[in-house]
Design a protein with these regions (language model features):
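Short linear sequence motif anchored by a di-proline
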Residues: 1-127
């Protein structure tokens, strides 16, 4: 994933898009929509709960390995590469069972110091 992304939709629209029941939306944990969401901030995610239902809730944007005693590590863990995540110690366990959908309106990639915003042609929700 990139280092910055945007979500300009309201959470009701996100819940509807991903078939999350109203009772399974934790509004109190969800951040305000933003066009500058950065690592270590609170983000919204859709994930399957232990009850087998989809839940929309807030989450810390990074990956904290189970063996870590702190959220703050000496190296960033928010940007796993799909081609190597299954073999890196920090990501291995999570790639097997901890999946989530991260809804976004778009994301930013930089060329030098200039950000470029990527989004769907008609601003449909990305995930």
């Amino acid at each position: 994933m990139c280092r910055r992304f945007a979500l300009g939709l309201d959470w009701d629209a996100v819940a509807s898009q991903f078939a999350v029941d109203e009772d399974d939306v934790r509004v109190d944990t969800l951040p305000q929509p933003s066009y500058n969401i950065a690592p270590t901030q609170n983000i919204g995610v859709v994930a399957q709960g232990k009850d087998g239902r989809r839940h929309l809730t807030g989450a810390y944007w990074s990956l904290v390995p189970r063996w870590s005693a702190s959220k703050v590590l000496s190296y960033p863990t928010y940007n796993a590469r799909v081609e190597s995540a299954h073999v890196k110690p920090a990501f291995t366990e999570s790639t097997k069972s901890m999946r989530a959908i991260i809804p976004a309106s778009g994301y930013y990639e930089w060329k030098g110091r200039r950000p470029f915003y990527f989004h769907a042609p008609h601003d449909e929700l990305l995930s």
